[in-house]
Swiss-Prot record:
Residues 3-127 form the ApaG domain. Gene3D superfamilies: ApaG domain (2.60.40.1470). Pfam families: DUF525. GO terms for biological process: error-free translesion synthesis. This is Protein ApaG. InterPro entries: ApaG_domain (IPR007474), ApaG_sf (IPR036767), Uncharacterised_ApaG (IPR023065).
Amino acid sequence: MYRALTRDIEVVVEPFYLEEQSDPEDDRYVWGYRIVISNNSGVAVRLVNRYWNITDQNGVVDEVTGPGVVGEQPRLSPGDTYEYSSGCPLDTPSGLMFGHYQMETDEGELFDVDIPAFSLDSPGLLRVLN
């Protein structure tokens, strides 16, 4: 698992290889990832936007931005957690992802919360990140 903490908001990522959706002979490698966001701060926040940097083993970068996550813009009161799962296809057997969520307080303050960098490694390959 990979963790990042920004302003007492913790993001934990657990990636996993989806062998049944992958086809290495056609250069298709697919990973899922589970993310848990915990609001350990004293203020409520809403996840309004996301930014992802997805880099394959050849250094090809895909930047993804958009509102919320998986069609939602969850509000987390102090002590709340929010969990979701998603996925990422690559044309190479490994890569990495990192990014941030843009959060908004009830008072309208916007700030970024880091998503830790994490490896996307096919089974049998050495891990890129620990």
